Regions:
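Short, Lys/Arg-enriched N-terminal segments with co-localized hydrophobic residues
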Residues: 1-13
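Structural/interface elements that position substrates and couple domains in central-metabolism enzymes
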Residues: 10-204
Length: 205
């Protein structure tokens, strides 16, 4: 973490790991890499190679434009341990496929990330961005005996994901008011999303 002190404003560069480079993950990686050090993780070598060449592996006009034209502190990797080991925040945007017949979300990919983060960097704040069932965040906090998991729902459209992050209708981040560290982390993450947005006056809750 690096602090730049000016007369009035303190700029903080955070180290952020993003697990997953689908619409949610890559749009967030692009948004946050404008002002922070971001490492994106994926299991597909071709996607990692493309991101490292600043070529979008998904169709999204704004992601393509920002990767090509903006100065972004963004790298991609296949190595989860290296991605998570020094991160202040780990954003989990892993797939959670929904089975409508069984009314079931497959959260195994999310929990695989949680387990690896707890192994290599247990103090990191994990922010779940994946689609998950009601009550899931609280259940994994109890299951893994850690307070360092929060949830921030996404309101994104495919092919418009970065645009919707740049012009958010609202920013929502869960917290634990009984834990000052988590309360501060939630406010910090909401501020990072606002900082990357074109319009920073959006209400966050």
């Amino acid at each position: 973490m690096i602090f730049y002190l000016y007369p009035v404003i303190v700029y903080i560069i955070m180290k952020i790991a993003i697990a997953g480079t689908g619409y949610v993950g890559l749009s967030l990686a692009t948004l946050l890499a404008q002002n922070n050090e971001v490492v994106a993780l994926d299991i597909i070598p071709e996607k990692v190679e493309m991101v490292n060449k600043f070529i979008s592996p998904i169709q999204d006009e704004y992601i393509e434009k920002y990767l090509a034209e903006k100065e972004l502190d963004l790298t991609a990797t296949l190595d989860g341990e290296s991605a998570y080991s020094n991160a202040d925040f780990v954003v989990i945007a892993a797939p959670t496929n929904y089975d409508s017949q069984k009314n079931y979300f497959d959260t195994s990919a999310v929990e695989a990330v949680i387990e690896l983060v707890l192994k290599v960097n247990p103090d990191a704040i994990m922010v779940i961005k994946s689609t998950i069932p009601v009550g899931y965040t609280e259940s994994v906090r109890k299951k893994y005996n850690t307070p360092n998991i929060i949830f921030s729902p996404e309101f994104l459209r495919e092919s418009k994901a970065l645009y919707d992050n740049l012009y958010p209708s609202r920013i929502i981040v869960s917290t634990d008011p009984s834990d000052n560290r988590i309360l501060d982390a939630s406010h910090t993450f909401a501020s990072l999303l606002k900082q990357g947005a074109v319009k920073e006056d959006r209400k966050s809750v």
